[in-house]
Amino acid sequence: MSDLDEESQIETQIDAPIEDIIRGSELTTTTADKETLKSANELLDSLEHSHRVDLSLHLYSAYLLKRLLYKANEKKHFYEVNQFVKTQIKDNWTSWPNPNTIIDPSVDKLYEDIPEGIANVSVQPGEISNRALMHASDMMRVELDAQWQKFLSKSALDHDVTLDVDELNIPNEISRNILVKLDSLFEGLHDKIAKENEFDVRQDKHSNNIRANQIDDEPMQANRRIKYTYHDLVSRGCEMNEDMTDIYMKSLELYNDIPEKYKKRKFRLPKQILKKYHQPKKTSSYLKELLSKTREDFIPVEKLLKDKRLTSKDKSKLQRLNREETEDALNKRTFFQVKGYLEDENEISDYELDDCLIELPNGNI
């Protein structure tokens, strides 16, 4: 076959309809190719199943979706994308587990036969009984045992050592130390946002006895506006004198580096969707007039957001500005906290043993 015939054959194949090319490729599919496709589909199903049952991956995917939606649309349509996220991707959208697909472990409940004669202790809504806490602690110890056995088995396999099955559980001292640190971590996080309980302390004029009365003994309602970030965890770890460098660097990768790798155009909302979330009516901005009339040198953004005279567009701009300033301040604070811990660890004391010695004067005292 001449070169001219080969070129004409190639051109004929290129000009052929795509349907004919696909149909021809299907005819040449071998049994090995089918097995490969079957294995690939099984692998994808397995990955999708692990994605559905992995809590951390589920929450991080939800965070990425919100972050990238804002990043791709907030420059020109901040109000619209903000309303879209609030109405379509609510906080309960990321709740876990999904009762329709995953069984709730219910660590706050304990099912057992109660002997007759013991009264059932009622628990207030939002409270957890001591028995439920003990049950949750036992489940935590089981998880710690599993992780401990995993690392021991890996180390034994690498060094060709046989382990005693009865000695694979994590020592009580280590597990107790881990639980104490977790209690301290959560207690510190709770103290940052908890409402302080007030007491009225008075002294009786006749008996000189001191009486303490609780001012507000009504049940507290959960504040759903409070949200924790990795800054709170890293900050609390530094307060506990823990080395949070690795966690801090990993957090920067998850929440700063990885979102920047995605292309924004893939997450831009169509105009048909954005039109549904336009402002109800166009009104003139009152923000400049409000700022010009005030006598204060500094006005908190939170105070401006509560002003009913501002339009939705003005409030959206202030919310975006407040979010950016808050994130920047939190990033700086967390960085200096981690850096301060490292400086304390590497700091060499200026005092030596000779500084503790006192030189006595010569002669008789």
Swiss-Prot record:
Report the function annotation for this chain: Component of the UAF (upstream activation factor) complex which interacts with the upstream element of the RNA polymerase I promoter and forms a stable preinitiation complex. Together with SPT15/TBP UAF seems to stimulate basal transcription to a fully activated level.
Subunit architecture: Component of the UAF (upstream activation factor) complex which consists of UAF30, RRN5, RRN9, RRN10, and histones H3 and H4. Interacts with SPT15 and RRN7.
Per the UniProt record, one Pfam family is RRN9
Q: Name one GO biological process term.
A: positive regulation of transcription by RNA polymerase I
Please indicate which superkingdom the organism of origin belongs to.
Eukaryota
Protein name, entry field: RNA polymerase I-specific transcription initiation factor RRN9
What keywords tag this UniProt record?
Nucleus, Transcription, Transcription regulation
User: Which gene does this sequence derive from?
Assistant: RRN9
Task: Please state which protein family the record places this protein in.
Answer: Belongs to the RRN9 family.
Q: Where in the cell is it found?
A: Nucleus, Nucleolus
